């Protein structure tokens, strides 16, 4: 148990560092990033509170009859995504305790879930939400439920499977790691399964999942027409726009069907391992991670900036799976290498070289150390890249501020040239080209609204 905890904590920390690659997407939205971080922390605190009182059998004390409903209410009130998750995770814990462990549940647990539902309703039905929708997203507000799903579903699925766009440390990287780890561990655990039909089913599904991951990896090599066809099977098009322009086309649904099948099979693995290990936390965290992303299918804004809670839950799943593999001596390093290769072939080669080199030095039961080293190497690499890009953009930012102040002080005409950032996704947005940002800049510095802002590329 101690080994499991140590392994999980180390890997969770390394993945947190690695995640700077995707965190860059939200860093310049400081208020939003802070909100997502705090609401995620609130959700995890509430989940642990419930888990400790229900599964860990921590004695319910008098203060819990006040604190637990209050925490549940405020967790339900945090935001649409975490609000739904607070209810969903609470229900899963109740199902596990009542129907799997067949244990009595204290009434305060039901009361807490009721308060979470009330908090969720306060959040969702608040008049301000409707006003914001009408003002900020008027077109989206006019869609019915089916149209909203058709408009947003490609972003939700793309964030889980589009490894080309989001890179190392992005959500697809963690999703594919989960798919692979779940498949291998399920296969190995099923070898001791007494139910032969279940054993064969799990093994067949595990093999199919591994083949899928390997085909995705091969598609990154662009070896021939047939592989390119498979590569396009993970290309998610906007369903609503496609329907409006061309009518119903079943072919665009193929990527969604494939991706849905992959997620459902992975959920089967997560539930199976949870039952075999008699630990509900793995299944609940994994299914909740997918639900957290799925909720965004009816979101008016891009789900990119709200992936933090999904990634956070997947970190826990990966760390827990790695600790199981460590204690049961199950080899999972190969999947890690393949997943690095899926993101970038060069990453795959580097991780393979590190894996082979360390395997020749360390004993075979130390594979988990190798995995930690590989993740650590790329985590440091990501931080160095982001820090360098941030410094470059920072110098441009201060140069633009200097130009604006000089323009205001000298009243130099009706055109103001501002430098374009090196890369928009590293901490700073451009000042030119987005009307609301231009208006904010002019208003803050007292620039005449008639002044034209012109973007100047760095030579």
Predicted regions mapped to residue ranges:
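Transmembrane alpha-helical segments
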Residues: 1, 40-54, 87-95, 177-185, ...
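Transmembrane catalytic cores of multi-pass membrane glycosyltransferases
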Residues: 1, 63, 80-88, 95-270, ...
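Membrane-interface micro-motifs in multi-pass membrane enzymes
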Residues: 7-51, 79, 248-266, 291-321
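Aromatic-anchored segments of alpha-helical transmembrane domains
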Residues: 13-20, 72-76, 116-124, 208-221, ...
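Short hydrophobic alpha-helices at membrane interfaces in multi-pass membrane enzymes
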Residues: 52-73, 110-111, 329-337
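Membrane-interface alpha helices of multi-pass inner-membrane proteins
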Residues: 63-91, 162, 335-343
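Signature aromatic-anchored transmembrane alpha helix within multi-pass, membrane-resident enzymes
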Residues: 200-210, 255-267, 272-286, 290, ...
